[in-house]
Design a protein with these regions (language model features):
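Buried hydrophobic core positions in alpha-solenoid tandem helical repeats
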Residues: 57, 61, 65, 105-109, ...
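Active-site-surrounding "flap" and adjacent substrate/cofactor-binding loops of secreted or lumenal enzymes
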Residues: 95-115
Length: 367
């Protein structure tokens, strides 16, 4: 009897191991997969498109977020979190964003509300709450034009998990999204500044003032400074004019000869998170001269446009030219992960940001 029991246990272990291996194998064959949605792995060797295709980029944006939401059933900063904060501002050009993903965000809000507050303040959860709040705020700003009860609730919860220093907690291992409290605090700030009428109604709120001081007095690396500039474009008075202009010049100073930007030039390897990716980054064959990538080129162009740099500026025109000539056949733009050379999920934001940036330059025709 005992022997049969052991045999049964081993059969169960082997069966579970096979199922897990098959699941891992499935994910390795795709960057995103769910039902009929199948997006191949991201690769630097993927061929370029001969002509810019907004339709392919949008399909990648929509299908990637949908597949992640259905399969992973979690709010991730790099995929459906990015969709939530990016897609609504393209409503005028692309139509309404996915109701399915907004509904998922609302359900996540309910689950967060039922979570113990101390647990919610740990790990990446404060950052997830900030992304959720910003995503709902963006929907209100660009889709309905008015503050929704769900957004107000999300912002309230976001304040409940704010840290003593005025920041929002994060992990420190998965740059650029899950690597610093400064990054997550810029997300929270964008949520507050974007929600229709919310910030004005708060007045001299203590929590808001603590957050402002945290952002104004922090010493982030240049990627964090880029995010601070982004916040300042929506938050009048957050920065003095000369400080804001210095941030603009700092971004332009990183532009490469080909017109693009490289995320790797915005922080030393040891400055990302707790420095746990430094060995990987320093071992890359292009470490001394990192190439331009979709994530950083799109983000820099987007922020510079929102900071008031004209689309006709020759430096921005060079960036536009780079984006139009570097889209891949899948519709995405390539960006090598700062973390592992496996899924390269950063190509997702590295496609959303170029779309947003090109839209600010009038290159996506309104519907």
């Amino acid at each position: 009897m005992e022997r049969k029991r052991h045999v049964g246990v081993w059969i169960l272990v082997l069966t579970l191991g096979t199922v897990i291996a098959q699941d891992q194998d499935l994910h390795l064959k795709h960057q995103y997969h769910s039902g009929e949605i199948s997006i191949p792995p991201a690769s630097e060797s993927e061929p370029f498109l001969r002509k810019f295709s907004p339709a392919l980029a949008v399909a990648y944006m929509e299908e990637g977020a949908t597949a992640w939401t259905r399969e992973r059933k979690c709010l991730s900063c790099h995929t459906n979190g990015t969709y939530l904060v990016a897609r609504p501002s393209l409503t005028r050009s692309l139509g309404r964003p996915s109701e399915e993903i907004r509904n998922f965000a609302v359900q996540q809000l309910k689950e967060f509300r039922s979570t113990d507050l101390e647990k919610l303040r740990s790990g990446i959860r404060p950052t997830q709450v900030a992304y959720l709040a910003q995503g709902l705020a963006e929907w209100d700003a660009h889709v309905t034009g008015k503050l929704s009860p769900e957004t107000e609730d999300a912002l309230g919860l976001m304040l409940e998990v704010q840290g003593e220093s005025g920041d929002w907690g994060n992990t420190d291992a998965w740059p650029p999204f899950e690597s610093s409290n400064y990054q997550s605090t810029t997300v929270a700030a964008l949520a507050m500044a974007t929600a229709p009428g919310w910030l004005a109604a708060r007045g001299q709120d203590g929590a808001v003032e603590k957050m402002k001081r945290y952002l104004q007095t922090g010493s982030p690396h240049d990627y964090g400074r880029l995010l601070l500039l982004w916040v300042s474009t929506r938050w009048p008075g957050l920065l003095e004019g000369e400080v804001k202009q210095a941030l603009v010049e700092n971004v332009l100073g990183h532009q490469r000869k080909d017109g693009g930007w490289s995320i790797r030039s915005f922080a030393a390897p040891e400055e990302w998170g707790r420095g746990n990716r430094a060995e990987k980054l320093r071992s890359e064959d292009q470490f001394q001269d990192p190439p331009s990538d979709g994530h950083q080129t799109g983000l820099c162009l987007l922020v510079l446009r929102q900071a008031g740099v004209p689309a006709a500026d020759p430096r921005l025109q060079r960036a536009v030219k780079w984006l139009l000539s570097h889209q891949r056949e899948s519709g995405r733009w390539w960006t090598r992960s700062l973390n592992t050379d496996k899924f390269h999920f950063i190509t997702y934001s590295g496609t959303c940001y170029p779309l947003l940036a090109l839209d600010t330059c009038g290159l996506l025709a309104p519907r």
